[in-house]
Curated annotation (Swiss-Prot):
Residues making up the signal peptide according to the UniProt record: 1-19
Listed InterPro entries: Fungal_M35_metalloproteases, MetalloPept_cat_dom_sf, Peptidase_M35
Temperature dependence: Thermostable.
Keyword Metal-binding belongs to the record: yes
Cofactor note: Binds 1 zinc ion per subunit.
Keywords associated with the record: Cleavage on pair of basic residues, Disulfide bond, Hydrolase, Metal-binding, Metalloprotease, Protease, Signal, Zinc, Zymogen
Removed propeptide positions: 20-175
Positions with a binding annotation for Zn(2+): 303, 307, 318
Organism: Aspergillus oryzae (strain ATCC 42149 / RIB 40) (Yellow koji mold)
Entry protein name: Neutral protease 2
Length: 352
């Protein structure tokens, strides 16, 4: 990993803790209906299927105007590479512009072009779907989560037309004035990297040969192959965090691309293996959490390293934020969920 000094770059993202809503027939849920508009342009209609109004964060979800991952695209069994950004959110102090409210039975609509964040120039049939959890917000604080799931949509892509769609990241250029890693930001990040390496190594050892029930709590299985995979990814994170002059990622101390909105702690560009910290990464997160499953700089950095395929392939997704959402995932989804690794590392460190 290359860290921003006067000539190098540096980047990271943060972990969001949530608590689950009460289970039952009135539990909130979102139904997502995907339809094709024209070639690679898709419409999503998100419906509140619960009996009460819900307010949720729409960043990293439908209605987010940024090039975020709203759907997964598959050719056969293989997922098409996502070429956008993954943003990490703070868990409190969330401002109104990041929140959407839907009454019972109400819907929101979002249109987007899947070719803007994936290479579909080869054309042919692809299948599109989306699932996960979106954070519930009450008085600016994440207090729970809402599960969402879409239909499977099959689209026969015209490759020629898809190739002409402007790529979201091709428009990204670094700002002329970039604050390199120096001063307090450099000091904070250096500490975060050291702590992330320590936590990742501890968690890797625990994953491979530690308490089975603790591993199952976060990854929903005690299968030895899964334990080995988790340990390998965590060791790869530790190795990357321990390198500030080489490695596979570029880590920005600041926001070179302009995606640090008021509620974003950091963001990742997986296709470029870049991570960027936002101002509130430094101002709102402690170096290490003193409470189980709380946000901090170290596990935020660890979380973001798992997103980068250059660290360990494939990079993880954001399928469930925080302990309660992450521990509701299936074993397969937990293995591919960034926060599952961050939460597990925190739990091993604090003996949760």
């Amino acid at each position: 990993m290359r860290v921003t000094t006067l000539s190098t770059a540096l980047f990271a993202l943060a972990s969001t803790a949530v608590s689950a809503p009460t289970a039952g027939s009135s539990s909130p849920g979102l139904e997502v209906k995907l339809t094709q508009i024209d070639n690679t342009r898709v419409k999503a209609v998100v419906k509140n299927t619960g009996s009460e109004e819900v307010s949720f964060v729409h960043l990293n979800f439908f209605k987010d105007a940024g090039p975020v991952k709203k759907v997964s695209i598959y050719r056969g069994q293989d997922e098409v590479q996502f070429e956008g950004i993954k943003r990490r959110l703070r868990s409190s102090g969330i401002t109104k512009e990041a929140v959407t409210s839907l009454g019972a039975g109400e819907t929101l609509e979002d249109e987007f072009d899947i070719a803007s964040t994936s290479d579909l120039a080869s054309g042919g049939p692809v299948s599109i779907r989306s699932h996960g959890f979106v954070p519930i917000v009450v008085d600016g604080k994440i207090t729970g989560y809402i599960p969402y799931k879409s239909n499977d949509l099959t689209v026969n892509v015209d490759g020629g037309k898809a190739a002409k769609v402007t790529k979201a990241l091709s428009q990204l250029t670094r700002r002329t004035e970039v604050t390199d890693c120096k001063g307090d930001a450099e000091s904070s990040l250096t500490t975060a990297l050291s702590n992330a390496a320590k936590l990742a190594n501890q968690a890797a050892e625990a994953a491979e040969s530690g308490d089975e029930s603790k591993f199952e709590e976060y990854f929903k299985t005690t299968d030895q192959q899964t334990r080995t995979t988790v340990a390998e990814r965590l060791r790869a994170v530790a190795k990357e965090a321990g390198s500030t002059s080489g490695g596979s990622t570029t880590y920005h101390c600041n926001d070179p691309y302009g995606y640090c909105e008021p509620n974003v702690l950091a963001y990742t560009l997986p296709s470029k293996n870049e991570i960027a910290n936002c101002d509130i990464y430094y101002s709102e997160l402690p170096p290490l959490a003193q409470k189980c499953h709380a946000q901090d700089q170290a596990t935020t950095t660890l979380h973001e390293f798992t997103h980068a395929p250059g660290v360990y392939q494939p990079g993880t997704e954001d399928l469930g934020y925080g302990y309660d959402a992450a521990t509701q995932l299936s074993a397969q989804d937990a293995l591919n969920n960034a926060d599952s690794y961050a939460l597990y590392a925190n739990a091993i460190e604090l003996k949760c």
